[in-house]
């Protein structure tokens, strides 16, 4: 989410050094509902893994529960299931299932970005950005529940 702030702590690698904010969004695997939103965080200062550990989601999940995640969370295999680096026949099915789950999460992200206020430069207080982000997330969730559903994912918990 581009913002008006300047400096290294806001610089986003994804946006080639432009200032931005990060949010942590968790989507339930079985229903596709947005279950957790945390942020805003300064893009250059907080990695995905740091946001997870310091932002509260780590303490909100059940002990022993594993989270489907992308490569930004590599390094904690007891908590995260990230894509396999080397595919074998045994883990190919699990990897394909995970890609479908991540694709559905990316669909939520794309729907959030359809709102210009999250796509364009933001020039107001960062706290207000958090309010706006959450309001947009509620609108996206309402749309998922009432006529624009996500595609189904057949998820097996045998990894």
Predicted regions and their residues:
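Short, well-ordered secondary-structure "scaffold" segments embedded in the functional core
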Residues: 1-159
